[in-house]
Amino acid sequence: MASGKVRCTRKLRSWIVEQVESGHFPGVCWDDAAKTMFRIPWKHAGKQDFREDQDAAIFKAWALFKEKHKDGDIGHPAVWKTRLRCALNKSSEFEEVPERGRMDVAEPYKVYRILPAGTLPNQPRNQKSPCKRSISCVSPEREENMENGRTNGVVNHSDSGSNIGGGGNGSNRSDSNSNCNSELEEGAGTTEATIREDPVFLEHQLPLNSDYSLLLTFIYGGRVVGKTQVHSLDCRLVAERSDSESSMEQVEFPKPDPLEPTQHLLNQLDRGVLVASNSRGLFVQRLCPIPISWNAPEAPPGPGPHLLPSNKCVELFKTTYFCRDLAQYFQGQGPPPKFQATLHFWEESPGSSHSQENLITVQMEQAFARHLLEKIPEEEKAALFLLQHTEQSPSALGH
């Protein structure tokens, strides 16, 4: 048997051909008679019928070949899969053939084409910086979208809107809205600078179609009385809809009993509360005279209560910080990141020793945050793990 050092200098192409020809790996076989395309089983590691010794065998073999895993070590099939996927997508000798793969069957598989020497894949592969190579390794299925639509991505969300007043006619906005707009514009530079500091992770975690819709939960006296989802970039929380010419969506509080104290408080809601949910995070602006305290990931230190100022835009949740904390959590370096913001409506301004229960509470969150934290696939978690190690060792995924 050749030494490990010799094996590591062999080409990925030769290794792949050898494994397909060997017949040792279930599901790994030629896809055409000319032996120019091959299949790789691609079952999700979280499936109940996942069999590591079969469904992950080829990926584990690649990890052993590259000396990234030793027999007896505790490894993760999703990490092994991501390593081989990265190697295939970085190589100029292979290209995926999506139309021949089947991901909607009991035994899903992908198909890759082995390109003749001297040819190029159908997708032009421009010379990439190390940063962009890392992006394509982490999320190759999104590479085309990111390369063709990068100006509409996370780094420059011109379509997401930074105005809490939304995308309607500016002439319909109040002066207070304009003030909030300018404050958001001032904060945009800081947010985008933070994004640029970690572009790889953000472009991976926040694809172009991320769901920034707003999830609202209304609570009266400690009891949930209603939930709704707002898909527009901004909205106004009101007691009753008005015939305003503004194009901003109006979201009504659930109707309590007319004699309840909650109704008396809602009668004072007046112009309501503006809420914006976009790629930068969650923002609110109090226009009503009701005292409102808030608790959110961006709350200042101290026990509070933290009161919303009148007619001033306040940032409750920042997507960049959430993604940073999410990566640390998946790497075992921190707790699950917080993503919920809470507004408490009071009959009178609460002090530091205020013990009276507030009558109205509104919980809000962005849909994408809960999705990433609770439902992100194991393969994506593995990609985050690999990303950090790739940045520490740029050649870790080479071949």
UniProtKB/Swiss-Prot annotation:
Region of interest (Disordered), residue spans: 118-189
Bias (Polar residues) ranges: 120-129, 148-157
Key words, A-Z: Activator, DNA-binding, Nucleus, Phosphoprotein, Transcription, Transcription regulation
Subcellular localization: Nucleus
Subunit structure: Interacts with STAT2 in the cytoplasm. Forms the interferon-stimulated gene factor 3 complex (ISGF3) with the heterodimer STAT1:STAT2; upon stimulation.
GO CC, any one term: nucleus
Name of the protein: Interferon regulatory factor 9
SMART domains the record matches: IRF, IRF-3
Molecular function terms, GO-annotated: DNA-binding transcription factor activity; transcription cis-regulatory region binding
GO terms under biological process: positive regulation of DNA-templated transcription; regulation of transcription by RNA polymerase II
Domain of life from the UniProt record: Eukaryota
Source species: Mus musculus (Mouse)
Residue range(s) of DNA binding per entry: 9-116
Entry keyword Nucleus: yes
Summary of the function given for this chain in its UniProt record: Transcription factor that plays an essential role in anti-viral immunity. It mediates signaling by type I IFNs (IFN-alpha and IFN-beta). Following type I IFN binding to cell surface receptors, Jak kinases (TYK2 and JAK1) are activated, leading to tyrosine phosphorylation of STAT1 and STAT2. IRF9/ISGF3G associates with the phosphorylated STAT1:STAT2 dimer to form a complex termed ISGF3 transcription factor, that enters the nucleus. ISGF3 binds to the IFN stimulated response element (ISRE) to activate the transcription of interferon stimulated genes, which drive the cell in an antiviral state.
Induction, per UniProt: By IFN-alpha and IFN-beta. Upon stimulation the regulatory phosphorylated alpha and beta subunits assemble with the gamma subunit and translocate from the cytoplasm to the nucleus.
Family note: Belongs to the IRF family.
Primary residence: nucleus
Modification type Phosphoserine: residues: 139, 393
